[in-house]
C-alpha cells in the first residue's frame, strides 16, 4: 500500500515517545501513520443478517476481513473501487451497511460489553451517525437513543444517516453537551461520549490533521472534555455505564480526563477493564483498564476508549436557565389511532408497542415510548419518525417511515429489477413489463424497501425524495 506524507510537529513526536508503552515500536508507529487507512464497513443488522449480507455480495468479489471487536464489521477491499464508489452501491443506498472506520466501532462494543442491555441511551456527540446507528442496531430498534449534536450543520447529516438505516427509536437534540447533567439528571442507563478532540489518530485519513496542533490546544480541549464528561456522568443513572472515547493519542485528552473524574467523584466512579473486550485487546490495555489504541497495533486509526460505571447518586447540578416551551404534539389514541394503524398496515407499514402515535396538526408521528419521560425537560430538534400527513383522501406516507417500518413480504410489495432500481434512485418513474395489481405499491429491491409509490396505469410514479436523488454512476455502472 502506498505511503503518504504526514505532517508531524516535533513537539507531537516528543509527546508520542513519552506516551507510547515500551512494548511498542516508535518506528512502527511512524510507518503505520504513513500508510493510508484500510476501508471498513459495518453491516446494518436492523435490515439484514451478517450471513445474508455475505451471501448477497458474494458475486461481487469483495474481499472482507472480520474486525475482531465488531461481529458485523469488516475491512473491505474491492477491485472496482474507482469504477463504483462504495457509497453508490445498491446495498449502501438501501441502508444495508454503513461506511465506518474500524476503530470507531470500539466505543459501542464497549458500551454493550458484558451483556449490557440499556433501554435509554444518550450519544452526546452523535454526528455523522456511525455510532448512533450502531447503538440502534445493538438495541434492535427498541428502547430509545437521545442523539445530540452541537454543530447545527451536522444535525442534518445525522438525520439523513439515521433515516437511511431505518432507525425508529431516536430523538435528535442540538445542544452543547454540557447542559445535559443539569437538564436530564440521572436519566440514562448508558451514555457514549465520543468527545471532540485534537484528532491525532486520524492522520492516516488526513495527512494534514496536525497542521494546527499544539500542546496548548491539547490542554484547552482537555478542559472542555472534562466539562462534557462531568455533564455526562451527572446524566447517567446510578448503576449505569458510560463510555468515553476519542480519536486522539495524547494522555491529557484521554487517561488524564478519566482520572480527573475518578479524583473528583472517588467511589462513585468505577473503571471497568476492557482487556477481555475482544481477542488481543490486552495489546492496547492501559494499567487503568482503558484501551489506548496506537495505529500500528491493529492497523487502524488511533483511538482511546474507557468504560466506567456510576456506583452512586450525585448531588444535582444547578437547574438550567433555559425554557423548553410548549410541546407541540398530542398523543393519538382510541379510534383515531386505530384508523391510522389500520391504514398503515394496509400498505405494509408495521410497528410494535415500542412506538406510540402522536399528532401535530395534519402530521402523524411515531415516538419511542422510552423518550416520553423526557418530554418537557429538553427541546428536541426531531423526535421519532414522521409517519404520514393526513389529507382529504387519506394519508401521505413518509419516506423515512417506509424505510424503517415497511414489511418487504407484504402483499403490495413489488420487487424491481436491477435496472429499475437504478432508475428509482435517479428519481425516474418505473415502467415494468408486468405492472403491479395494487394502486399503492411498496417498491423493493434485494427484498429491501425503497419507498411507497402509486401505480398510474402501467407506470409506477417515483416518490423518492428529491434531496436523495442520485446522479453519476450507480450500481449497474451506467451514468
Curated annotation (Swiss-Prot):
| Positions contributing to S-adenosyl-L-methionine binding | 125-131, 149, 176, 194
- Major localization listed first in the record, in broad terms: cytoplasm
The entry's family comment says: Belongs to the class I-like SAM-binding methyltransferase superfamily. RsmB/NOP family.
Put simply, this protein is called Ribosomal RNA small subunit methyltransferase F
Its UniProt entry gives the catalysed reaction(s) as:
cytidine(1407) in 16S rRNA + S-adenosyl-L-methionine = 5-methylcytidine(1407) in 16S rRNA + S-adenosyl-L-homocysteine + H(+)
GO MF annotation, one? rRNA (cytosine-C5-)-methyltransferase activity
Decide whether keyword rRNA processing is in the record: yes
Amino acid at each position: 500500500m502506498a505511503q503518504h506524507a504526514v505532517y508531524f510537529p516535533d513537539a507531537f513526536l516528543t509527546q508520542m515517545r513519552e506516551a507510547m508503552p515500551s512494548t511498542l515500536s516508535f518506528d512502527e508507529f511512524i510507518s503505520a501513520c504513513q500508510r493510508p487507512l484500510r476501508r471498513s464497513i459495518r453491516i446494518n443488522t436492523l435490515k439484514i443478517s451478517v450471513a445474508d449480507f455475505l451471501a448477497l455480495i458474494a458475486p461481487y468479489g469483495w474481499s472482507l476481513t472480520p474486525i475482531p471487536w465488531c461481529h458485523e464489521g469488516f475491512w473491505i477491499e474491492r477491485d472496482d473501487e474507482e469504477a463504483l464508489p462504495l457509497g453508490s452501491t445498491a446495498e449502501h443506498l438501501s441502508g444495508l451497511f454503513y461506511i465506518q472506520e474500524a476503530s470507531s466501532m470500539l466505543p459501542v462494543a464497549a458500551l454493550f460489553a458484558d451483556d449490557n442491555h440499556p433501554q435509554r441511551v444518550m450519544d452526546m456527540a452523535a454526528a455523522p451517525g456511525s455510532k448512533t446507528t450502531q447503538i440502534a442496531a445493538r438495541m434492535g430498534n427498541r428502547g430509545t437513543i437521545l442523539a445530540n449534536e452541537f454543530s447545527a450543520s451536522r444535525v442534518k447529516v445525522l438525520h439523513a444517516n439515521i433515516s437511511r438505516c431505518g432507525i425508529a427509536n431516536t430523538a435528535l437534540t442540538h445542544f452543547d453537551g454540557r447542559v445535559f447533567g443539569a437538564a436530564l439528571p440521572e436519566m440514562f442507563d448508558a451514555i457514549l461520549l465520543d468527545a471532540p478532540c485534537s484528532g491525532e489518530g486520524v492522520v492516516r485519513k488526513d495527512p494534514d490533521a496536525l497542521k494546527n496542533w499544539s500542546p496548548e490546544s491539547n490542554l484547552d480541549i482537555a478542559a472542555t472534555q472534562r466539562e462534557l464528561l462531568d455533564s455526562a456522568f451527572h446524566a447517567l443513572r446510578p448503576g449505569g455505564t458510560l463510555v468515553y472515547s476519542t480519536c486522539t493519542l495524547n494522555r491529557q485528552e484521554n487517561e488524564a480526563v478519566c482520572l480527573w473524574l475518578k479524583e473528583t467523584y472517588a467511589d462513585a466512579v468505577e473503571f471497568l477493564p476492557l482487556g477481555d473486550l475482544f481477542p488481543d485487546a490486552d495489546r492496547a490495555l492501559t494499567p487503568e483498564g482503558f484501551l489506548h489504541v496506537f495505529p500500528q497495533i491493529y492497523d487502524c486509526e488511533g483511538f482511546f476508549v474507557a468504560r466506567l460505571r456510576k456506583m452512586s447518586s450525585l448531588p444535582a447540578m444547578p437547574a438550567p436557565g433555559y425554557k423548553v416551551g410548549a410541546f407541540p404534539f398530542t398523543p393519538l389514541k382510541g379510534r383515531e389511532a386505530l384508523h391510522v394503524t389500520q391504514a398503515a398496515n394496509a400498505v405494509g407499514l408495521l410497528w410494535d408497542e415500542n412506538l406510540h402515535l402522536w399528532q401535530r396538526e395534519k402530521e402523524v408521528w411515531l415516538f419511542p415510548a422510552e423518550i416520553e419521560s423526557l418530554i418537557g425537560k429538553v427541546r428536541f430538534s426531531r423526535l421519532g419518525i414522521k409517519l404520514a400527513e393526513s389529507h382529504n383522501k387519506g394519508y401521505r406516507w413518509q419516506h423515512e417511515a417506509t424505510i424503517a417500518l415497511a414489511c418487504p413480504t407484504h402483499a403490495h410489495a413489488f420487487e424491481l429489477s436491477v435496472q429499475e432500481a437504478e432508475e428509482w434512485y435517479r428519481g425516474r418513474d418505473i415502467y415494468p413489463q408486468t405492472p403491479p395489481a395494487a394502486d399503492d405499491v411498496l417498491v423493493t429491491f434485494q427484498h429491501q424497501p425503497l419507498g411507497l409509490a402509486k401505480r398510474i396505469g402501467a407506470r409506477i410514479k417515483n416518490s423518492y425524495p428529491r434531496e436523495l436523488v442520485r446522479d453519476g454512476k450507480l450500481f449497474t455502472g451506467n451514468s
